């Protein structure tokens, strides 16, 4: 009897596995189970079906082995950047560009893209335009490629400033440029190149928002169109956290865009992109996009640009993103808007969108959201790891009366927040109370109790200093807790009053050993640096604190972390010229070891020790001028110390003019005369530039 005809088992199994794999990949596009239904009906998916997918992308060819070897060596040379002269590097770059001619697409879509990124970083405006034109017509495929997407991102960032430069300078000869050597070359402005690129992506924006590689490039392009500054890589929503940072040794290659003036065509294109990105998408799918790991950050950026560039009145436009997300007026429990807000508060992705809404929403809308969902819940929300950041954004928009009410709720939760090491809401609360002139006494009382030790308030508990026992720790987790603790301590010191004095007193009472440990700790030392240059630090505190390091300055100057504390001591010795000279003497005693160390050489330079060694009198005169011509004042009244010590920051170390010094000394003399009931005695000290005699130096 004939058997039923069947296909071979292995081929059928392979097809079945392929179908299962495709289904599984599709279901992973959204991370929430309730969004799986979106895959079948989401309009974004229909757009994606029409767009070129990665498995159907054109193949641009491969480099042969000889070309790969050449480009690999060129990449290594550019990474090291050890050319004898700029001219040598220019010649080398010209030869690499010549070798890459006609191979740009092959390089961009392979591992050689690293070299192409470095070439873009060092390219001239003409070279950027040429590469733009080589990529033209292929951008839709390139932005979806694992390697080429990074090249596109770098190209956009490097080319963006040229748009503003072209528009700033009126070039009447722009259209009359002599023909280039290449008859096929098209002369076009950088502005039009960006617009042509956007035209290629038009109709696919919805799909690209959730594409693994293209979503990051799309965000960069949106920022460029808006003229907004591009945030640093560590905190930016425009770049992938997994992106390899391609750098050039010794070059200023931080790809940061400052705020720029962009042409009107860019703003028109941006408005069209914002409109096209959500047009035709039902509200249900748009809300699902809010918690998508790739689409969520893109939606945040679109919403931010919509409200900041086209007016908050856009909230009334039914086609706007903010109205599509929150259509109900008023927003009340049970409405679709309420369901969305309650769902975003505790979501790791969606909470960022809620922060954007709170930060940029019109005042009337913000008051509705705050009064309906957050006014009575500020304390409980602050305890949550995710919702705590939403609380921080809310605090930034509250008026004085609402802030006082929110403070009362959050203050009750401070012991719980400290126990859970969630100090970010406390830090923001202190900052806003200072800005709104709200009394911080309740916060001070709770923090003093929460961080109490055998000797009262202990700053080491905030900084987690005693927990460093030399054991290896995870990169994140506890290190983040230390960072947040350090930021809290620094914020407390900005408060002029009992709250800030908690930290200053605790630091001043540390033992010399613990002070050295504090200076050597990479995170905790930032608190010490901030304390030394704080405008609220008294002369008494700075003197006591710096004395803890006597005899150890040479060691600290050689430590990569503690060397920053030594630099801060220079600014911390304003009004303490004798101590500044004492520190310089210790540095001079350790000259050999400092000169042999890269870290030590920086400290030596910052303290101007070459001048100290060669012309000590000039150094002393300059040091005393910047440290205060009144030189060292021993044990001034605590009430006057804040007045006597000028504001000290790393930026504000300017020289005081003669008239300013005269006024300062006259005020100090009058205050002393009023207190003692007699005129100050005149000595034989040399006079300053104002003709007044400074007080004598008091030895320690």
From Swiss-Prot:
Keyword line: Nucleus, Repeat, Ribosome biogenesis, rRNA processing
Pumilio repeat spans: 200-239, 336-371, 372-412, 509-547
UniProt-listed InterPro entries: ARM-like, ARM-type_fold, NOP9, Pumilio_RNA-bd_rpt
Signal peptide interval: none
Record field: transmembrane: none
Region (Disordered): 1-49, 634-655, 667-700
GO molecular function, one term: RNA binding
Bias-annotated ranges (Basic and acidic residues): 10-39
Pfam families: PUF_NOP9
GO cellular component: 90S preribosome; nucleolus; preribosome, small subunit precursor
Main location: nucleus
Compartment annotation: Nucleus, Nucleolus
Family (UniProt): Belongs to the NOP9 family.
Family annotation (PANTHER family): NUCLEOLAR PROTEIN 9 (PTHR13102:SF0)
Function: RNA-binding nucleolar protein required for pre-rRNA processing. Involved in production of 18S rRNA and assembly of small ribosomal subunit.
Stated name of the protein: Nucleolar protein 9
Gene it is expressed from: nop9
């Amino acid at each position: 009897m004939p058997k039923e005809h069947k296909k071979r088992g292995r081929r059928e199994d392979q097809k079945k596995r392929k179908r299962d794999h495709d289904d599984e990949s599709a279901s992973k596009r959204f991370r929430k189970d309730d969004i799986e239904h979106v895959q079948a009906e989401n309009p974004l998916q229909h757009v994606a079906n029409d767009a070129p997918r990665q498995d159907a992308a054109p193949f641009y060819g491969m480099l042969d082995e000889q070309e790969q070897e050449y480009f690999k060596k060129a990449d290594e040379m550019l990474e090291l950047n050890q050319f004898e002269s700029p001219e040598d590097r220019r010649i080398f770059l010209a030869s690499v560009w010549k070798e890459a001619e006609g191979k740009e697409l092959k390089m961009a879509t392979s591992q050689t893209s690293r070299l192409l990124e470095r070439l873009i970083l060092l390219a001239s405006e003409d070279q950027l335009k040429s590469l733009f034109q080589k990529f033209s017509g292929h951008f839709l495929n390139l932005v979806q490629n694992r390697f080429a997407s990074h090249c596109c991102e770098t190209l956009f960032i490097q080319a963006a400033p040229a748009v503003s430069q072209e528009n700033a300078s009126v070039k009447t000869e722009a259209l009359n440029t002599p023909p280039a050597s290449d008859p096929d070359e098209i002369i076009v402005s950088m502005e039009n190149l960006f617009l042509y690129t956007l035209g290629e992506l038009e109709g696919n924006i919805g799909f690209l928002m959730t594409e693994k590689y293209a979503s990051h490039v799309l965000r960069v392009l949106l920022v460029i169109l808006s003229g907004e500054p591009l945030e640093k890589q560590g905190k930016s929503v425009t770049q992938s956290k997994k992106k390899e940072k391609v750098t050039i040794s010794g070059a200023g290659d931080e790809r940061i865009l400052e705020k720029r003036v962009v042409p009107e065509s860019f703003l028109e294109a941006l408005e069209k992109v914002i409109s096209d990105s959500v047009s035709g998408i039902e509200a249900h799918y748009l809300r699902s996009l809010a918690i998508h790991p790739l689409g969520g950050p893109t939606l945040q950026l679109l919403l931010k640009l919509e409200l900041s560039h086209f007016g908050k009145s856009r909230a009334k436009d039914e086609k706007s993103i903010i109205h599509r997300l929150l259509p109900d007026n008023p927003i009340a429990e049970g409405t679709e808007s309420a369901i969305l807000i309650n769902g975003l508060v505790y979501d790791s992705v969606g909470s960022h969108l809620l922060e954007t809404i709170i930060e940029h929403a019109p005042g009337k809308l913000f008051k509705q959201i705050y009064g309906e969902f957050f006014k009575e819940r500020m304390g409980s929300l602050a305890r949550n790891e995710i919702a705590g950041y939403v609380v921080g954004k809310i605090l930034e928009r509250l008026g004085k009366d609402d802030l006082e009410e929110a403070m009362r709720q959050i203050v009750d939760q401070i012991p719980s927040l400290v126990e859970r090491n969630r100090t970010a809401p406390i830090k923001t609360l202190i900052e806003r109370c200072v800005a709104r002139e709200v009394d911080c006494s309740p916060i001070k009382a709770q923090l003093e109790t929460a961080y109490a030790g055998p000797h009262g308030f202990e700053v080491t508990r905030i900084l987690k200093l005693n927990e460093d026992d030399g054991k290896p720790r995870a990169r994140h987790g506890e290190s983040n807790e230390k960072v947040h603790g350090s930021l809290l301590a620094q914020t407390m010191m900005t408060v002029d009053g009992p709250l800030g004095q908690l930290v200053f007193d605790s630091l001043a009472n540390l033992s010399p050993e613990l002070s050295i440990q504090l200076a050597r700790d990479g995170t905790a030392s930032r608190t010490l640096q901030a304390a030394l240059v704080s405008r609220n630090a008294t002369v008494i505190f700075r003197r006591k604190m710096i004395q803890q390091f006597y005899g150890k300055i040479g060691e600290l100057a050689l430590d990569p972390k503690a060397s920053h504390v030594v630099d801060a001591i220079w600014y911390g010795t304003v009004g303490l010229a004798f101590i500044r000279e004492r520190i310089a003497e210790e540095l001079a005693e350790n000259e050999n070891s400092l000169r042999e160390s890269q870290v030590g050489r920086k400290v030596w330079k910052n303290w101007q020790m070459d001048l100290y060694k060669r012309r000590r009198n000039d150094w002393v005169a300059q040091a005393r001028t910047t440290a205060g011509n009144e030189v060292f004042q021993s044990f001034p009244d605590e009430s006057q110390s804040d007045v006597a010590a000028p504001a000290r920051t790393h930026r504000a170390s300017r020289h005081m003019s003669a008239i300013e010094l005269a006024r300062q000394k006259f005020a100090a003399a009058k205050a002393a005369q009023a207190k003692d009931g007699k005129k100050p005695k005149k000595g034989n000290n040399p006079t300053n530039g104002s003709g007044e005699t400074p007080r004598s130096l008091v030895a320690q």
